[in-house]
């Protein structure tokens, strides 16, 4: 029973440490490293095929030029061309480029497989992590932000990691290989090409440095937008009831504006890379042609070298743009990975694998004796809200906890079920300290009907028998009859096999009845009713109350309700205020005492009486 999705917002994070985050990601992918290495080797091998191609084209060009010693009647004489050699070179070129295409395809397939498996593992890790986080984490982080990490951030990793790594390796290989081949063919032309490209490289590095912070801000702003939209959608009735549309729109516009500001800046700077590299490449073509022509006229190089250099200058500048794009994608990947790993590294609940399940084991059923002894608790250190709570509840008793908002009623039930850990004192069930057994063993002893109803996508049967194996159809139907829901369910198109979800056209009262039927089917020794009838009409409340009276027989039950009419028959009423029990007793005893409870009761029923 956490305090809700608007319990807090995540603080603005500092720009991430790129190397540290990528190191974590590599470590997370360590099981796939052999496949990644093979894929990168294949990509590098394909790039080598691409690099060798222009050199072979140079040889082919030179062979053809050698066969053109003179021009006769304005036409080239082709008799001296060695077509055998030219054909052999041509087939070699075909083999090289086919090899380049095949190796590139295999590399892309392998990297796509690895990155999607990594994304799958990340989602699974997040899903497991959610169940290990204490509820206090969700008091300070919006649900929308967590959803953003599961969807947007993991998708960003899956989309960018494989492409970025592959492009990075092939770009480096292509850059180095083209540089080596250019020096091999002609040093002067190579130095001219490097000089033409150096300008673009300097500008590229400056842009990458500037854009990194905007990618991190973009991911942060996206989480804020998702969090706000999720909260407003979940609470849209409250927003309308309180005329909060203007405030909601104002907040959304602020978050959306932040996303726009960081988004356009990161995309604009990233988008500068391609036109910049195209300019550098075209400028390099001009330099190569001019210098190459001068050297050819001087007899220092063959014509084929110019042809090869025109291709090599493209292969030399292309990696610069690819490298820039790959690094930009890695920055986006790192920004998303930092948020995902930040979530995965959040402190978890204490590992309890070494604790024995002492409740309801070895054939000994839990009776339901509950003891609170000097319990203390606070959501924040140094800010206690439960100061010194003590109470003894015998098995089968119906205990009502009442008090004003913020008195600590729901908090006490949260502590009883170990949703939160107490700061002092102890809570025991049948004499067993709840901290000495695993949480799941404590949870098994409770059935719950919460203030906020919950229906998941599935049939009516599946909803009622949630997480309870072995439930028979008769048990489900009997529970629905007990709460007066059977007739309505049978009127549905498929009866108990009708598929429901959270958007199903069930009234709030019907959802409440369904959750009560679910609690009946669980058949746990202790029952928790948190505002169980606060969302239904008087007639439905009466039906529910009768069903609850039958359900609570022989079971320990804790009822939290503002409607005091539902707790008149309670065996014990605990009146709380400011985290302390200020009164306790039966309904008649508390009325006779004329204290806080009597004032509260009289304020509700004076007119009715």
Kindly give the residue locations of the regions a language model identified.
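An intracellular "coupling" helix at the cytosolic face of ABC transporter transmembrane type-1 domains
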Residues: 31, 135-136, 152-161, 165, ...
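Juxtamembrane loop-to-helix connectors within ABC transporter transmembrane domains
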Residues: 20-21, 29, 111-112, 131-175, ...
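Alpha-helical segments in transporter systems
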Residues: 23-26, 34-59, 93, 108-112, ...
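Transmembrane helix-loop-helix hairpins at lipid-water interfaces of multipass membrane proteins
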Residues: 36-103, 183-188, 299-303
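Transmembrane helices of ABC transporter permease
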Residues: 31, 35-48, 163-217, 288-301, ...
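Helix-loop-helix
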Residues: 181-195, 265-338, 343-344
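Short intracellular "coupling" helices and adjacent cytoplasmic loop segments at the cytosolic face
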Residues: 3-13, 116, 124-148, 152-154, ...
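ABC-type nucleotide-binding domain
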Residues: 358-609
